[in-house]
Each structure stands twice: as C-alpha cells, then as structure tokens.
Curated annotation (Swiss-Prot):
Short sequence motif Golgi targeting: positions: 864-867
Annotated site location: Cleavage: R460, S461
Organism from which the protein derives: Equine herpesvirus 4 (strain 1942)
Intravirion side: 810-919
Modification comment: A proteolytic cleavage by host furin generates two subunits that remain linked by disulfide bonds.
Assembly: Homotrimer; disulfide-linked. Binds to heparan sulfate proteoglycans. Interacts with gH/gL heterodimer.
Classification of source organism: Viruses, Duplodnaviria, Heunggongvirae, Peploviricota, Herviviricetes
Domain of life: Viruses
Record field: transmembrane: 789-809
Virion surface side: 29-788
Gene Ontology cellular-component annotations: host cell endosome membrane; host cell Golgi membrane; host cell plasma membrane; membrane; viral envelope; virion membrane
Subcellular location: Virion membrane; Host cell membrane; Host endosome membrane; Host Golgi apparatus membrane
Pfam families recorded: Glycoprot_B_PH1 (PF17416), Glycoprot_B_PH2 (PF17417), Glycoprotein_B (PF00606)
Disulfide bonds: C81-C586, C98-C542, C172-C237, C330-C378, C607-C647
Protein name: Envelope glycoprotein B
Length: 919
C-alpha cells in the first residue's frame, strides 16, 4: 500500500504540475478559438482513412485543455503514414549502360578549287572582206539635178584576191564580181577600167574593231546634156578586223558587224575537225596551212605562220585562225580557290565545308569522271596549277599531300577539285606504324582509301603473307579462270566502247546563286553544335544517374522512407526487408493539426525530440476523432510519440510546421519563424551551356554583271555603234568627213624641204612654223565666222559701223556747209531767234550793211579759237600718256603765243547799231 500510495501521490503531483503549466501557457500564448480553422490550400487525398488510427477512448478534460492551448497550423499540408507491412515491395533499378559520345566523323582536310559552268562565249578575232557597191541614178534637168534611184549591195571578196592583193600588196581591186539571180554581174569603180587601189585606215572605228577601205567618196556623175538620166558606180573594198563569238555547242559564230556564220569556228580539214558542224558547201570553205597575213597598218607580214580558215558567204568573206577545240574551248571555268577545306563523310555523302565563304557543298562519295562532261580537259591542268600554287605558298613546310586530285560533282552544278593532305606529324605516325607492322601499303591509299575506287588493291609483301605452292590442279584451274576473265574483260571493253559512243555527254549546269550552300553551312554548324551539346549532356546525365544510384542504394538503408519518397515523388513510409523495400502510401490529413507548446514528457528527465501534436484525420471531427501524435520531418505527423531524448540544457530547435518554422528553446515554444529569415543553401548543380557563336553570311556572286552581260551571241551595243558609224566610215559626207587640204599642202612643202638635206629641212621647219601660225590664225578666224554666233556678231558690228559712218559723213558735210551752225548750234539758234524778234519776219533783206572791221575780228577770233582747241587737245593727250614731251610742247606753244603781242583790240561793250537805232 505504501508503494501504491507513493506512486499515486507522485502521479497526482505530476498532473497538478501539468495543469499549472498548461494554465501558464494559456496565459502567455493566446489560444486559437474553437471556431472552424482555415483549410489547407493543397488538394485533398482520395484515399480512405485507416479506421485503426481513430481513437476509441474518450479524452479526459486534461487532454482537451492541452489541445486547446496548442498552436493551430494555419497553412501547409500534413501527412500521416501507416507502418509498412510488406504487402507492397519495390527494388532499385540496376545501373544502365550510358551512350558513348561521338567525338566526330571522318574528317579530311585539304586544298580545293571550285569550278562553275562557263557561260561566257568563246571569243576570237576574225577578218571580214567585202566590197560595197553603190549605183546611183541622177536626173539632170535644165536648171536642177535630182537623185532618182540608188542601189547598194555587199559582195564578198574572192579568196584569190585576198591572197594576191590584200595580204600580198596591201591593195584591192576596183572591180567587183557577184552573182545575183543566177547572173554574174560586174561593177567598176567610177565606171573606169580595173585598177589596184591602196587600202587606207578608216577614220572612224569602234574600240573593238579596225577597218580599211579603198575610198571615202561615192561617185555621182552628172553630164552636161540636160533632160537625161546619168548612172554612176562606186566600188569600195573594205577589210574589217572584228570580234567573233561562239557559244556551246559551237556550231556557229557571230561577228560584231551583225553577220552570223553558220559553221563551227573549230571546223577544219583535219580528221577531228571535220566532225564539226558546217552548213556551207565545201567549195565555199578553204583552209590554208602556214599562212602569213599582212598587217595593213604597218604593211608588214606576220612573223609566225598560222592555219587560216576562209569561208565565203553570199555577202562577205570571213577568215580566222583555226585552233583545236579541246585547247581553246572549255565548258567549265574556275570560280573559287579554297586554301582550307574540310571534307567529312556523313550518311553516304561527302560534305565539303568552307569557312572562308560560309558554305557547305554536298556530293556523292564516288568521284566524278571528267570524261562524262564535254570539253573539260582544261579543268585538270587549272586545278593542279592552282592547288600546287597554294601548297607552295602556305603548306609546303607543314603538310604533305595524302592523295591525288579528286573531282566531285556537288549539288547545284559545282565541280570540286579536292586534294587531301595531312600534317607532317601525322604522316610520321603513319610511317612508323607501317614500319612497325612490316607492311608495304602505299601511304596515299592507306591515308585516303576512297581516292580511287577503280584501282586494284595493292598486294602485301612476301614477308608478311607466304604464297602457297601451286599444284597441277590449281594451275589448270588458274588457266581456265584466266581465259574466262580475259573474255569477260573483252566483252566489258566492247560494251563500254559502244556505250561511250552512244552516250550523249551532258553539260554541267550551275545555279546562279549559292544561297542553298550557305544555308546548308549554317544548318550544319547549328546541327553539329546542338548535337554535340545534347550528346554530352546525355552522357553526363546517364553517368550521374549511375553514380547517384549507388548513393540511393546506400542511403535507403539509413532513411528508407525519405529515399523512396524522393524516388517515387510521393509520400510513402518504407522499411527495408532484406534486398527489397516495403512501402505504404501516406494519407493527407484533412483535419486540424495542433502543436503543443512544450516538448517535455511526464518523466522529468525525458523530453520529446520532436514537438508533440494533436490532430484529426477528417474535417469537422468530434472530440473522439482527436489523435495524439508527434510532428515528423517535412510536415509528416506520426501517430505515436516515440521520439524521445534525455532533456538537455540550453536546447534550441527549429521545426517545419506547415509553410513556416517554429522555434523551441529549452523544450518550450517561443515563436514562429518565417522562411525568409533562414538562409537557404542550394544543393543543385548549375548547368552551364555554351551559346552558339555568331556567323555572318557574306553576299557572293557566282556570275558577275560583266559575265552576265557577256553571255549573248551578239554584242548589240557593238552592232549599233558599227551600224551608226558605217556611213561615216566609208562614205563622203561633207558635214562629217572633211578633207584637210591645208595639211596636204603643208605635207608637200615639208617633203620638198626634206629633199634639200639638213639645211633645207631646218629652213623648212622655220617656214612651216610661220606658215602654220598664219594658217592657224586664218583658220581660227574662218571657223569663228562659220560659227552662227560669230557670224551674227560680225553682222551686228558691220551694221553698227555703217550707222556710225553715216552720222560721221553727215556731220562732216554739215561742217563744210555751215561750220558755225555745226560747232555752235545753240548759239546760232538763239541769235536767229533774237534777230527775228528784233526786226520781225520781213526784215531779212537788210543784210548788206556789214562792218568790215568786225568781220575781220571775227575771223581772228575763229583762228585763235581753233589754236586754243588744238592746245587743249595736246595737253589732254599728254596728261593721259603721262609723258613730259607733250607738256613741254604745249608750254612752248603758249610762250610763243604770248610773245607775239596783242593783235586785236578790246571789243566795245555797247552796240553801235543799237545806239543808232535809239537815235
């Protein structure tokens, strides 16, 4: 009884202390009202609640008080997990095999030359020989002449005349023979007998052509007898050196004169040249070996003989230098020289990447045979020369060639001449490997096995593979196989020869733009970068997963529930059962969760390691549905309170409660702590990816503007220039073609003085210089007069001079008839008016009474007035000239006049006539 009483007393004391403690807490911390708490924001679990979790006993008032004094979780999701029973077991997946990252494809570096379709025509120089015939018919009337008809035609010059006159003497015949309407016609220049005329250069020529002719004049004869028709003929022999063009398939060519010759420029009498196209009869064509033409300017023969072709058309004769077709014509032309090219094989095709022009070309892995395209003999030589030049400049000291030049036809019609090469270090490694393995393979075939797919494989050395000893049966079998092989080879050769003759060679057509190649380069660049990045990420990810799998496998033994929950991304309770894990799914708590303020248990030396809670599984549960448990990690609620520890001094704990943290000190609740007050440390590894580098697209022209303009068969601008200058070049037009007769005369005088020796030449130079100055002055005046503005100015000056001469003549005549009136018109008019007023209109007959003395004085006055006027003019001229001679002369004249003394008396101030009248 003593023990029972003692235990009962202790229990009573503990309960009393708890009640007192609860009362204190209630006073310190405001309790949450018993109203309906806030509902968590998370979704509700669809699982049913285990009935074993619900309590069966009725809670006592002490527990209700403790629950009411707790802290209600206002936000956050809470879960409760039943213990795993083994009904559901799982296992961790074994390690996976990770993909290996491909570091690259089969790359080959080298030098390349890219060819394109040659759209430019084949150009060459040609000579055109013809005679321009002009027949004019003029009607002569009594007082006029009119042109009634004019006939113009071009006729070819015979090849014999070209041989004997034009290219032999630099002359041409004035006679023309031509066939019209099956009748042979003859024409003679100036209607005279046949003569040989010199070919002189034309004054007017286009930049791309030269011309010579025998005359600049067109004859037009008019007789003396009127009322008749007169006919005259002009024959002008013309030789033109022009540009000729021909395009593929070179079955004709055009001249810059506008004429088209329907024969191939490569047609000839040799075996291969006879197969070329020719639309004319054989007698119209002629080929001369070792021909030496004459330069009509210098009158000298050509230095080297050539093979000359002559063809006669109905209007002209054309000649040109014959050359072999394979040497001159080529259907491909060089576009780009690439000093750095990378070739890689991808999905059965080659990709040629050129970073310098940001382009990628795609072709088959089989080489292109140049024999399959027409006229491609120039490609091999140009490609080899260009590649060798680049190699000598940049790679001779660092790289070696690993194969011959290979040709590949890329998409878009580009032919790539590629020659692979490797560095010197890599070549040494290959050679050391060959020496180590005692092999005799060709280094080029070893480094570039796809260089020649048709060549036989090289046999190994006798030291490496011993040959078996032949037997009789094997010899017989070898002979039979040899015969069968020989027949098969002969049949194949015959088939190939027939196929070659029957197969039509196909011309390579090139696109006018390489935008597709630039887009291919951009796509390949992006694809390579992205694929490499993704491959590395996939490999690294798989490796990391395998390593983490080992960590998961070990950590599941420590905390299986946390590991399995993180793996399944779902709240579960787990327990290790040997090599498997038993799990049960956690249930979301829909009810309220209350956190108690104290973590102390009934034992004074034992405390809870995690806060105790009370909760309800469902909403609106009564007091019977309240469960006592303990707060676990990550808002998990245990249905039991088994997590205890010895009570410690200065204990501090933070626990996650909902979305916030609660702080306990000395196992007593202090306050809530928001997550923002707690610093976060991240366990995530940042993924650092490299961004794509920038690529700029450069505009490239496959064909320049000049090439596109030069693609036509005819140069129409040249034709128009030629046609417009044709009349100016060969006809006598006074307004355009002027013969400089002065130059002819001066040239004759110079020739005369040159014949007199050096002294005569010197004298001639002086004479010609002076004469040239005079002629230039006269010609300048004449040209000024010929100018309309000059003529108008001269006419106005002549009219002004005539008007001035008329007024001067009138003034002189007035001086002679009445000098006083001319000199003093105002004084004379006033005297006349005064006299009329004094004597009236009828007193004019009183003019006989004159004073002789006054008349004499008047004469003296006039004399001295003239002398004064002369002196004033002399002084004025002296002042203008600023010279002292005139001033001295005028002063001397004044002194002389003063010394003469007065020879006249002073006039009277009164008029005696008036005094008489007054009387």
């Amino acid at each position: 009884m003593s023990k029972d009483s003692t235990s009962l007393g202790v229990r009573t004391i503990v309960i009393a202390c708890l009640v007192l403690l609860g009362c204190c807490i209630v006073e310190a911390v405001p309790t949450t009202p018993s109203s309906q708490p806030s509902t968590p924001a998370s979704t509700q679990s669809a699982k049913t609640v285990d009935q074993t979790l619900l309590p069966t006993e009725t809670p006592d008032p002490l527990r209700l008080a403790v629950r009411e004094s707790g802290i209600l979780a206002e936000d956050g999701d809470f879960y409760t997990c039943p213990p795993p029973t083994g009904s559901t077991v799982v296992r961790i997946e074994p390690p996976r095999s990770c993909p290996k990252f491909d570091l690259g494809r089969n790359f080959t570096e080298g030098i390349a030359v890219i060819f394109k379709e040659n759209i430019a025509p084949y150009k060459f120089r040609a000579n055109v020989y013809y005679k321009d015939i002009v027949v004019t018919k003029v009607w002569k009337g009594y007082s006029h002449t009119s042109l009634s008809d004019r006939y113009n035609d071009r006729v070819p010059v015979s090849v014999e005349e070209i041989f004997t006159l034009i290219d032999s003497k630099g002359k041409c015949s004035s006679k023309a023979e031509y066939l019209r309407d099956n009748i042979m016609h003859h024409a003679y220049h100036d209607d005279e007998d046949e003569v040989e005329l010199d070919l002189v250069p034309s004054k007017f020529a286009t930049p791309g052509a030269r011309a010579w002719q025998t005359t600049n004049d067109t004859t037009s004869y008019v007789g003396w007898m009127p009322w008749r028709h007169y006919t005259s003929t002009s024959v002008n022999c013309i030789v033109e050196e022009v540009e000729a063009r021909s395009v593929y398939p070179y079955d004709s060519f055009a001249l810059s004169t506008g004429d088209i010759v329907y024969t191939s420029p490569f047609y000839g009498l040799r075996s291969a040249a006879q197969l070329e196209h020719n639309s004319y009869a054989q007698e119209r064509f002629r080929q001369v070996e070792g021909y030496q033409p004459r330069d009509l300017d210098s009158k000298l023969q050509a230095g080297e003989p050539v093979t000359k072709n002559f063809i006669t058309t109905p209007h002209v004769t054309v000649s040109w230098n014959w050359t072999e077709k394979k040497i001159e014509a080529c259907t491909l032309t060089k576009w780009k020289e690439v000093d750095e090219l990378v070739r890689d094989e991808f999905r059965g095709s080659y990709r040629f990447t050129i970073r310098s022009i940001s382009s990628t070309f795609i072709s088959n892995t089989t080489q292109f045979k140049l024999e399959d395209a027409p006229l491609t003999d120039c490609v091999s030589k140009e490609a080899k020369d260009a590649i060798d030049s680049i190699y000598r400049k940049q790679y001779e000291s660092t790289h070696v060639f690993s194969g011959d030049v290979e040709f590949y036809l890329a998409r878009g019609g580009f032919l790539i001449a590629f020659r692979p090469m490797i560095s010197n270090e890599l070549a040494r490694l290959y050679l050391n490997e060959l020496v180590r393995s005692n092999r005799t393979y060709d280094l080029k075939n070893l480094l570039n096995p796809n260089a020649n797919h048709n060549t036989n494989r090289t046999r190994r050395s006798l030291l490496s593979i011993p040959e078996p000893t032949p037997t009789q049966e094997s010899l017989h079998r070898e002979q039979i196989l040899h015969r069968l092989h020989k027949r098969a080879v002969e049949a194949a050769n015959s088939t190939n020869s027939s196929n070659v003759t029957a197969k039509q060679l196909e011309l390579i057509k090139t696109t006018s733009s390489i935008e597709f190649a630039m887009l291919q380069f951009a796509y390949d660049h992006i694809q390579s970068h992205v694929n490499e990045m993704l491959s590395r990420i996939a490999t690294a990810w798989c490796t990391l997963q395998n390593k983490e799998r080992t960590l998961w496998n070990e950590m599941v033994k420590v905390n299986p529930s946390a590991i399995v929950s993180a793996t399944l991304d779902e709240r579960v309770a787990a327990r290790v059962l040997g090599d498997v894990i038993a799990i049960t799914h956690c249930v979301k708590i829909e009810g309220n969760v209350y956190l108690q303020n104290s973590m102390r248990s009934s034992d004074s030396n034992t405390c809870y390691s995690r806060p105790p809670v009370t909760f309800t599984i469902t909403k609106n549960a009564n007091s019977r549905g309240t469960i006592e448990g303990q707060l676990g990690e990550e808002n998990e609620v245990y249905t039991e309170r088994k997590l205890i520890e010895p009570c410690a001094i200065n204990q501090k704990r933070y626990f996650k409660f909902g979305k916030e943290y609660v702080y306990y000190e000395n196992y007593t609740y202090v306050r809530k702590v928001p997550p923002t007050e707690i610093e976060v440390i991240s366990t995530y590894v940042e993924l650092n990816l490299t961004l794509l580098e920038d690529r700029e697209f450069l505009p490239l022209e496959v064909y320049t503007r000049a090439e596109l303009e030069d693609t036509g068969l005819l140069d129409y601008s040249e034709i128009q220039r030629r046609n417009q200058l044709h009349a100016l070049r060969f006809y006598d037009i006074d307004s355009v073609v002027n013969v400089d007769n002065t130059a002819v005369i001066m040239q004759g005088i110079a020739t005369f003085f040159k014949g007199l020796g050096k002294v005569g030449e010197a004298v001639g130079t002086l004479v010609l210089g002076a004469a040239g100055a005079v002629v230039s002055t006269v010609s300048g005046i004449a040209s000024f007069i010929n100018n309309p503005f000059g003529g108008l100015a001269i006419g106005l000056l002549v009219i002004a001079g005539l008007v001035a001469a008329f007024f001067a003549y009138r003034y002189v005549m007035q001086l002679r008839s009445n000098p006083m009136k001319a000199l003093y018109p105002i004084t004379t008019r006033s005297l006349k008016n005064k006299a009329k007023a004094s004597y009236g209109q009828n007193d004019d007959d009183d003019t006989s009474d004159f004073d002789e003395a006054k008349l004499e004085e008047a004469r003296e006055m006039i004399k001295y007035m003239s002398m004064v006027s002369a002196l004033e003019k002399q002084e004025k001229k002296a002042m203008k000239k600023n010279k002292g001679v005139g001033l001295i002369a005028s002063n001397v004249s004044k002194l002389a006049l003063r010394r003469r003394g007065p020879k006249y008396t002073r006039l009277r101030e009164d008029d005696p006539m008036e005094s008489e009248k007054m009387v």
